[in-house]
């Protein structure tokens, strides 16, 4: 199949393919929307002769968190209602479609570790070992008014971590490869979950408190050494670690590739159209049913020609925008509408309690051709009272690194407009380089940022899956840091709800959107 699936065919105006058929419209071309389309086409009640699906995406497939995520999969993720199903479906999809080659699926080991990367500790080790360590990555520059996302010891409200499942590609296409505001949310952060697991599994070094930091680290490595094949980390700086999962419970994939592949399989049926446009409103009738929407067609400049090259080399390939002065186009032959818009859901449903958490990430080409397959959730001591908490995911040809989230800016109009704070990316690269010579001697490939969809209710971590209190209007959103992990289950369950009238593969009554907001309040 090659990588032809990375460039799906699209249109900007509705086709006539839905005439005389049950027409299901999915708003949002991220991993949730694409998995929903795929599992609809796989449902035994679905037939291209009687059903048609239109995916409406404002900018590009997997242009947000679905393309910018780390891609960590874990059987111990949340929520428990759908995680076992989704983890199993990921394996089944890989087995069926050669996920190892098509979207870099593989099982791996996940660890949590604490390391001391203070300058004095590093200098002491180098002096004692008589081995110099040259850090090739300079400290990040701070712009005026910029404060990093490190948090002080004792803070009980550190910002929600952006996970390996839900994160990052630069603010444009992935085709070309004040103070921090802490988030108060019922959603547990990935770091809080793993720290809890670490406390229950690790060999504590608390009995070493009376000795020097260097001696502590040396003693810890004697009694609790890191796995031998985790050789791209400076193990002498690690003072505690824990296994969070082996190949039986954790895996990874490249989310951008996966999303495009699964969409291509849905479109192969001939029953799925991809429409580029920005949905600007839904229309309810007097019975609180919704069967029509309006959208602004996206304008695409500099498309690829028949040879796959840009038509105009002076314009960025695939530049997309919406003409806000254009007359909206109405689609009114819809039987069911699914909103899988992630943090943009509340742009349409004003009462929906889903907001966005911005997360930065970088990808690094390591100095070694390959690094051993580990996902690492780190807590780095950077000075006497500050920690920094990056996550590192070794891919086949690069290492993905992400940091904690922030709410410093509002959600922009599209995923292309997400502001990337270069200093945050530089900070990520600087601190992980202290821990890894392989990364320090490598080179930075990409700086990027995206928004994660967070459900802001005290009684649920999300997501919301199912029909709203508006008939035939459905939502699949609010997956927080586990959107990549839980996408197949969400897609399968949505297909059951849309075609059978109920979810049968998992019990998800607690994820019912009707419990949390009023969908009749439209934009």
From Swiss-Prot:
Phenotype when the gene is knocked out: Leads to cell death when overexpressing the camptothecin mimetic TOP1-T(722)A mutant.
Start and end residues of each stretch annotated as Disordered: 157-189
Residues forming coiled coils: none
Pfam families in the cross-refs: DAO
Localization per Swiss-Prot or TrEMBL: Cytoplasm; Late endosome
One GO CC annotation: cytoplasm
Gene Ontology annotations of biological process type: retrograde transport, endosome to Golgi
Residues recorded with modification Phosphoserine: 189, 204, 306
InterPro entries xref list: FAD-dep_OxRdtase (IPR006076), FAD/NAD-bd_sf (IPR036188)
GO molecular function: oxidoreductase activity
UniProt entry keywords in alphabetical sequence: Cytoplasm, Endosome, Oxidoreductase, Phosphoprotein, Transport
Location, primary (coarse class): cytoplasm
SUPFAM superfamilies in the record: Nucleotide-binding domain (SSF51971)
EC numbers: 1.-.-.-
Ranges of Low complexity composition bias in the record: 157-172
Summary of subunit composition and partner proteins: Interacts with BTN2.
Function of the protein: Putative oxidoreductase that negatively regulates the retrieval of cargo from late endosomes to the Golgi. Regulates YIF1 and KEX2 localization. Required for fast DNA replication.
Protein family (similarity comment): Belongs to the TDA3 family.
Additional observations: Present with 5240 molecules/cell in log phase SD medium.
Protein name: Putative oxidoreductase TDA3
Organism encoding this protein: Saccharomyces cerevisiae (strain ATCC 204508 / S288c)
Species lineage: Eukaryota, Fungi, Dikarya, Ascomycota, Saccharomycotina
